[in-house]
Amino acid sequence: MGRTVVVLGGGISGLAASYYLSRAPCPPKVVLVEGSERLGGWIRSVRGPDGAIFELGPRGIRPAGALGARTLLLVSELGLDSEVLPVRGDHPAAQNRFLYVGGALHALPSGIRGLLRPSPPFSKPLFWAGLRDLTTPRGKDPDETVHSFAQRRLGPEVASLAMDSLCRGVFAGNSRELSIRSCFPSLFQAEQTHRSILLGLLLGAGRGPQLDSALIRQAQAERWSQWSLRGGLETLPQALHAHLTSRGVSVLQGQPVCGLSLQAEGRWKVSLEDSSLEADHIISAIPASVLSKLLPAEATPLARALSTITAVSVAVVNLQYRGARLPVQGFGHLVPSSEDPVILGIVYDSVAFPEQDGSLPGLRLTVMLGGSWLQTLEARGCVLSQELLQQEAEKAAATQLGLNEPPSHCLVHLHKNSIPQYTLGHWQKLESAAQFLAAQKLPLTLAGASYEGVAVNDCIESGRQAAARVLGTEPNS
């Protein structure tokens, strides 16, 4: 009788793990268990009354690097090539990104010329930040906060404006608490290997497995900055679900896991609300803190490490305006914490993906709210009403983009504990977990956004590598 692998969590990580398990030459029996009634996790696309697409979670995927190429390969394997909407390298959404500082939008400099001349909100050309990086010695600490690293290597302005904003945009987090080693491993490794971020990124480019497909070649030739799918990014988890069903994978929805216990023969018992499953191996693609509450007493040290990997909430407000125009054309803008503790940034959805605008002319934006403001309100037990979040989002659109008319359509969603926080020393938590799993020979593999990357590409790769480890194949092949 073959092995049974139970995958916990039907977000993109769990779906990817199940997909790669099911495609093995001699696949195990795979059971995917999802607690909610829908698959896809935070990836969710909603169609408005006029057919416009609103993304409640991620809205674009980067094609760059080995992970970006692997996701494009997955898209092709699922037969979705014709659904891809690319943002090509010459498009304003690829070339223009902004910071909102001092009550105004400022274009981030790009190209050599942009680095050599003063570019507000920075007081001097960013060339000097690059020169500082080239002359700064390598750091000696095994980890460092993003703010400390950026200030040491690139200067206080880059740290407090650019990197602060980037941490808010990617992690909805605080650059003074987040780990450079875990949040931006390529920057950390560049310094460790080449003593310089710039040298490391230049000399380290192109490493990793070279994947090939028509879609990958097209993305490289046209220098895509990101891509989406015609019907929204939720098309990807929907296609994965259809594929899994066709391969005989058992997909259980609306079945929250109540507990995990080890049987005498070393198999797992997965307790659901009204039934239970047995598994030879578990891939957990649920949040680390959730898993920590399900583990048996024998895994208390592991549970303790996982419980310290916390996550923050983010509010996403989708706004649609009729007949409105943006003051600038680009991907969107980020807001440093010193400027506005409420607003993380605004994405100009209609610029990147006008094909998703719907039948009537209109402008789609996504306002992201979170950070310390949201954390403080949550800590006080305040009720975060849809009215409050919509009011703050509309105020930001008016103040920062001049959109003073009320929106024609609005969606408000508060994603509770949605983005894991890789705080200083996160790598030690992962090392501790890995050492415990190896020492105890527990048939458990960890996957998902809690560990080594929160982007869609990272989550898909996390699921793929988890499947490879269970199958005993080479994760990098």
UniProtKB/Swiss-Prot annotation:
Q: Which cofactors does this gene product need?
A: FAD
Q: In which tissues is it expressed?
A: Detected in liver (at protein level).
Give me the comment on cofactor binding: Binds 1 FAD per subunit.
Q: Which InterPro entries match?
A: Amino_oxidase, FAD/NAD-bd_sf, Protoporphyrinogen_oxidase, Zeta_carotene_desat/Oxidored
Recorded hits in Pfam families, A to Z, give: Amino_oxidase (PF01593)
This entry carries the following GO cellular component terms, namely: mitochondrial inner membrane; mitochondrial intermembrane space
Q: Where in the cell is it found?
A: Mitochondrion inner membrane
GO BP terms in the entry: heme A biosynthetic process; heme B biosynthetic process; heme biosynthetic process; heme O biosynthetic process; protoporphyrinogen IX biosynthetic process
Provide the reaction this enzyme catalyses.
protoporphyrinogen IX + 3 O2 = protoporphyrin IX + 3 H2O2
Sequence similarity: Belongs to the protoporphyrinogen/coproporphyrinogen oxidase family. Protoporphyrinogen oxidase subfamily.
UniProt function note: Catalyzes the 6-electron oxidation of protoporphyrinogen-IX to form protoporphyrin-IX.
What is the protein name stated in its UniProt record? Answer: Protoporphyrinogen oxidase
* Origin species: Bos taurus (Bovine)
